[in-house]
């Protein structure tokens, strides 16, 4: 047996290692690609007879050359995967629907129709947006454990600690003003935008105009959702019209949510506050305004100061009536006593809870579901995003960051 080892040249952090064995008139070729973000291993056996030294030398040289070329090719492939997402748009063109849309928005929002027409004439249709609006296939089971791991992870926790430390005064002032705990505000901004790092790159005008005119008709709530985005487009244009420069080149998520807290235009209009007192509301670049606005949002939806968001859930299987407990979904509908009558085993704190409670079920793929007992405040958190998975991720992220802050003192 004889062997040779080659390392190709690097290309974009990609290195291919080739190891050649000659055994039993067979050449065994091992290729390992180790870019910084992955490791791929290939092994190929080539039944080839090479008896002379010059032929072996030529073969090894050919392998080395192939490795060098493959390195570049593989690196290019990996680089392609990591390119930023390209947003493709096309013109709407002159259409009667745009004129009617401008007329409706002008009437609803009391802004000049000529100005609205001009703004909509600059809007472009976002390609592929309709697919993003469709609900996930039913074949994709929900998984709380996987969802939780996306948000409760070291980098986001570290960023949350820095955000808390940097904006300690504003966070505590928001808590004192609105009664909403610091950790909840920090949790929301962390889940929504990774503390301002991911605020979206779609032009909000393009997104909302596209969805107002081309919401996918096969969506189960197509009519309702299309009306919602038409309304949001109106709020957005009114918001822009009120600004001194009337800038419409604001970017956000593929649904039109904007800024540090990812407010939709209607939420910006109703709940955004000038929390730093500089005379203007800015959720795009001013985290202090975002802090006050998130707290104001929760207060407006009925946050009750001092009330927990949830309690642990345990069951008395002998008398458990789970179907009845789950029927109202996450809407608090049962007193503590009623829950216990239906088979819940509540902690002493939960037993003394004055308001209604809900049994919240979170699926874990093929594994057993997780459960918590949600309070009215848990339900309030779901008004920010109508998902119990989202609400619990926000709550847990904030709690972990609060613990890190406490331990650092």
Placement of each model-derived feature along the sequence:
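C-terminal soluble interaction/assembly domains
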Residues: 316-409
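Cysteine-centered motifs
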Residues: 14, 18, 26, 33, ...
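Short, functionally critical alpha-helical segments immediately adjacent to catalytic or ligand/cofactor-binding
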Residues: 116-127, 181-196, 236-239, 294-295
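Acidic, glycine-anchored loop motifs typical of Ca2+
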Residues: 274-283
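An acidic, Gly/Ser/Thr/Pro-rich helix-cap/linker signature
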Residues: 76-166, 172-175
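Boundary at the C-terminal end of the N-terminal hydrophobic targeting segment
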Residues: 71-75
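Substrate-binding/active-site groove segments that recognize
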Residues: 205-217, 258-273, 294
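Secretory-pathway/luminal and periplasmic proteins that interact with or process carbohydrate-rich
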Residues: 125-132, 193-203, 214-219, 242-248, ...
């Amino acid at each position: 047996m004889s062997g040779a080892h080659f390392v190709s040249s690097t290309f974009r952090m990609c290195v291919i290692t080739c190891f050649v064995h000659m055994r039993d008139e067979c050449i065994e070729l091992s290729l390992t690609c180790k870019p910084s973000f992955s490791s791929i291993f290939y092994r190929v056996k080539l039944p080839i007879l090479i008896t002379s030294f010059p032929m072996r030398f030529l073969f090894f040289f050919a392998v080395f050359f192939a490795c060098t070329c493959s390195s570049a090719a593989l690196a290019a492939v990996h680089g392609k995967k990591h390119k930023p997402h390209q947003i493709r748009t096309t013109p709407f063109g002159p259409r009667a629907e745009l004129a009617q849309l401008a007329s409706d928005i002008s009437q609803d929002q009391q802004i000049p129709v000529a100005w609205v027409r001009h703004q909509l004439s600059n809007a472009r249709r976002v390609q592929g947006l309709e697919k993003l609006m469709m609900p996930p296939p039913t074949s994709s089971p929900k998984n709380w454990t996987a969802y939780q791991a996306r948000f409760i992870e070291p980098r986001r926790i570290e960023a949350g600690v820095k955000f808390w430390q940097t904006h300690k005064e504003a966070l505590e002032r928001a808590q004192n003003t609105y009664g909403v705990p610091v950790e909840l505000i920090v949790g929301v901004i962390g889940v929504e935008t990774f503390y301002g790092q991911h605020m979206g790159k779609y032009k909000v005008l393009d997104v909302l105009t596209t969805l107002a005119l081309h919401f996918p008709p096969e969506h189960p709530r197509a009519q309702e959702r299309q009306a919602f985005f038409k309304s949001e487009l109106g709020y957005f244009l009114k918001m822009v019209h009120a600004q001194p420069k009337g800038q419409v080149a604001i970017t956000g998520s593929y649904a039109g949510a904007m800024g540090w807290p990812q407010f939709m235009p209607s939420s910006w209009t109703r709940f955004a506050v000038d929390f730093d007192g500089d005379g203007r509301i800015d959720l795009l670049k001013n985290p202090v305004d975002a802090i006050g606005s998130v707290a104001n949002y929760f207060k407006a939806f009925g946050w009750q100061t001092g009330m927990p968001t949830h309690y642990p859930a345990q069951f008395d299987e002998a008398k458990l009536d789970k179907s009845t407990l789950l029927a109202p979904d996450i809407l608090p509908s049962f007193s503590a006593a009623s829950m216990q009558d239906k088979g819940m085993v509540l902690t002493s704190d939960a037993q003394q809870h004055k308001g209604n409670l809900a049994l919240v079920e979170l699926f874990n793929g093929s594994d057993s579901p997780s459960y918590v007992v949600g309070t009215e405040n848990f339900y309030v958190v779901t008004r920010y995003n109508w998902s119990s998975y989202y609400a619990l991720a926000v709550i847990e992220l904030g709690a972990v960051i609060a613990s890190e802050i406490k331990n650092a003192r």
